[in-house]
Amino acid sequence: MPVVRLYYEDLEEMVGASRELIIERLPMMGADIGKSPEADYIDVEFFPDRPDLYSAEGVARALQGFLGIRPGLPEYQVHTGSVEMRVDESVKSVRPIIGCAVVRGLRFTDPFIESLMSLQEDLHWGLGRNRRKVAIGVHDISRVRPPFRYIAEDPDKRRFVPLDFDESMSMREILERHPKGVAYRHILDGFERFPLIVDADDNVLSFPPVINGELTRVREDTTDLFIDVTGTDPVVYRALNIVVTALAERGGRIEGVRMISPDKEWISPDLSPARWTVTTSEANSLIGFNLSAEELAECLRRMRFGARHLDNDSVEVLVPAYRADIMHTWDIIEDAAKSYGYENLKAEMPRTLTIGRPHPMEELKDEVRDLMVGLGYLEVMPFTLTNEKVHFEMMRRSAGECTRVMHPISELHTIIRTAVLPGLMEILSLNQHHALPQRLFAVGDVVIDGRTKCHLSAVSIHSGAGFAEISSLVSAIMRELRISAEVVESSDGAFIPGRGADLMLNGARIGCFGEIHPEVISAFGLEHPVVGMELELSL
C-alpha cells in the first residue's frame, strides 16, 4: 500500500493544528502510522482505495474537515486559460485518452517537491496499473510555447533529450537505453507509432507513458506547471483531478486547457462535484447509528462532502471531483461512520454462539496452493472480470455463453471469466521484463452457466517449454488430489493441434492442458513457448 511521508512542520502549517492532535486523530481516518521519536516526519499508510490521500496536501485537506477546521466541500475554481491541446487522430489506436491542466503561482519547497513526486508515482501504481492505464507528466510551462499537440509518430523520426540525460535520443533508443524506457517499454509492445506531446516549436514535452523531456524539468524556481495525464481508461480524468487539487491546496491557481480532438472540444479539468442522495434509514441500518438527517449531513461535511438535509430521511451529497473511490452510497455511508467515530458504537453481545470451521473447498484450495508451490510455481491472482477480446478472441476460442456486466465502467471489464488460463497469459504479457523461466498458477472462481466453480490453472514460459513438462505437472496434480481422469486429444483452439489434451471424468470435461498455440502467444505479445493447464476443482 502507498506510504505517504508527512513532515510535521509542513503538515502543521497546512492543517492549522498541533502535531499531537494530528497524530491522535489520523488513525481514526483509517491511517496506519509508523513514526520515530527522533524524526521530523511520520510515514502514514492508507488503504489503496483513497488515492486522494496519497499526498501531504490530500491528507491535510482531509484532516481540516475531520477536525472541524474547514468542513464541507472544497471549492476549486477553474479559471479561463489560453492554452490549447490539439489531440491528433493518430493517438486513438495507441493511447487515446488525455486530460490536461495548467497550475500557476506555485512556490516549491523540499517537502512540496517530495510530496508531488511521491503522489505522481503512487497514482501510477494505484490508478494507473504501473502506467499502463494512467501516466502523469508534470512540466515547467515557462520553457515551452503552446498550443501543444498530442500525436503518435514513428519511433525513429524525432530526437529529444529525455529527463536525466544530456544526449538527444530517438524514442526507440530511449526504450533500449534509458532506465525508464527499459522499465516501461512493454506497454508499447506491438505498436508501430508511439505517443508524443510537442509544443508549437516542435519541442518535446513528453513521451508518455515512459519519460518527460529534460527541457520541461521542474526546478526549485518553477512557478507555473503544465500537467498532462494520458492513458487507456477514463480514470485518467480522476488522476488529473487529484493532482491539480493537491497543487491548489499549495496555493496554485488552476487554469483550464482547451482540448481539441477531431470529434469534440472540451475544457480540462472538470472539477464539478457529483451529486448523490443518501437516506438516514439506510445509513442507520447499515452502521447501527441513530442519526437524524442533519446529524448525518454534519458527519459528511467533516469528511469534505457538500451535504444538506432535504427532509427527515434524505441528505443531498456533493462528492468532490478528487474522490475517485465513491462508487456506491455505501462508500459515502462508510465515511459518515468514520466521521461519527467507530469508538461511539456500543458493543453488543451476539445473541447466538456458533463455532466456525473451514469450508471443505477452502481446505482443498489450501492443499492445492501448497502442492503448486512445492512444484516450483508462483501464485498470482488474475482479475475475475475480463473482456471478450482477451478471454475468447486472443485465446482462439469461440465466444460461448458468459455472464456479462450490465453497466461496465471500462471496456476492459465486461464479462465474468469462464476460465483462469487467459488471465495467466495476460500476466505473462505484463512480466516480459522479468527473467525466464516463469512458472505461475492461480486458484480462483469462474462462472459457467450461471454457476460459480473453482478452477486451478498454471502456465510455464521459457525456451524449452513443451508438452512433456505440462503433462508431468498435470500427472502430479491428479495423483496428489486422487483424481482419476481419462486423457483424450483436445480440439481446444488455445493449444497446438495434436499437442493439447482434455481431462475427462464420467464423460464430462474437467480440464485441459498442452502447448499454447503460437497465434495465442503472439496475440499476448510473448516471444517464447508457453505451456498451460486448467482443472476444475469443484467436482
From Swiss-Prot:
The alphabetized UniProt keywords are: Aminoacyl-tRNA synthetase, ATP-binding, Cytoplasm, Ligase, Magnesium, Metal-binding, Nucleotide-binding, Protein biosynthesis
Q: Which CDD domains match?
A: PheRS_beta_core (cd00769)
Read off the InterPro entries from this record.
aa-tRNA-synth_II/BPL/LPL, B3/B4_tRNA-bd, DNA-bd_dom_put_sf, Phe-tRNA-ligase_IIc_bsu, Phe-tRNA-synth_IIc_bsu_arc_euk, Phe-tRNA_synthase-like_B3/B4, Phe_tRNA_ligase_beta2_arc, PheRS_beta_core
The catalysed reaction is: tRNA(Phe) + L-phenylalanine + ATP = L-phenylalanyl-tRNA(Phe) + AMP + diphosphate + H(+)
Record's superkingdom?
Archaea
The UniProt record lists the B5 domain at: 271-347
Q: EC number(s) on record?
A: 6.1.1.20
Q: What is the name of the protein in this document?
A: Phenylalanine--tRNA ligase beta subunit
